[in-house]
């Protein structure tokens, strides 16, 4: 696992993320971008992914393996306390990241190369920890605080993980998985291409 605080150094990008009122409009909708070797980054989320994984990655793999890397699956998520009537959940259950459409159709588990969680906006929250069970389901999880401008890279397809309940405030994050080959939902349209 890699954790980098104050990850994005580009103040104009951070300001754009803080001020974009539409960034979290599609919470839980899985999107796909084939990377800059297929098409230029044309949305704020794609520009963020390019900054995270191509221009400023603490892990060298994506920069030097575009032949192997098919692209990026990404989605946003927001969680708030269960007593707040805003239609949001207060937690995310324990799971592995995987090709969800394929798993639902066949039961086969195919996982991404690596996973990422990034916190793009300031938050004042209690709870909402990313808990990663790298020692197995029964082991004590690693608990990572949701913190503004923090990048977390981990084996999301190998280790069970979840978001602990949020008891105060609004937890906001974007998750990005790197894939090769692309998950099946790209071909079937269950994972959308963001415009």
Report the location of each language-model feature.
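Fe(II)/2-oxoglutarate oxygenase catalytic core
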Residues: 1-151, 158-195
């Amino acid at each position: 696992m890699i954790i980098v605080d104050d990850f994005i150094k580009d103040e104009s990008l951070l300001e754009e993320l803080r001020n974009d009122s539409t960034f979290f409009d599609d919470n839980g909708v899985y999107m796909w971008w084939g990377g800059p070797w297929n098409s230029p980054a044309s949305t704020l989320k794609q520009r963020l992914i390019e900054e995270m994984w191509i221009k400023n990655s603490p892990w060298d793999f994506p920069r030097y393996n575009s032949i192997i890397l098919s692209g990026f699956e990404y989605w946003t998520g927001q969680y708030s306390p269960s007593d707040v009537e805003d239609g949001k959940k207060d937690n995310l259950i324990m799971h592995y990241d995987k090709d969800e459409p394929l798993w639902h159709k066949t039961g086969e588990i195919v996982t991404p190369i690596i996973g990422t969680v990034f916190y793009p906006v300031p938050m004042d929250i209690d709870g909402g920890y990313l808990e990663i069970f790298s020692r197995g389901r029964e082991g004590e999880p690693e608990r990572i605080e949701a913190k503004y401008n923090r990048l977390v890279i981990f084996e999301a397809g190998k280790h069970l993980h979840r978001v602990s309940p949020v008891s105060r405030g609004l937890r906001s994050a974007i998750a990005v998985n790197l894939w090769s080959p692309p998950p099946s939902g790209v071909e079937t349209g269950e994972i959308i291409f963001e415009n």
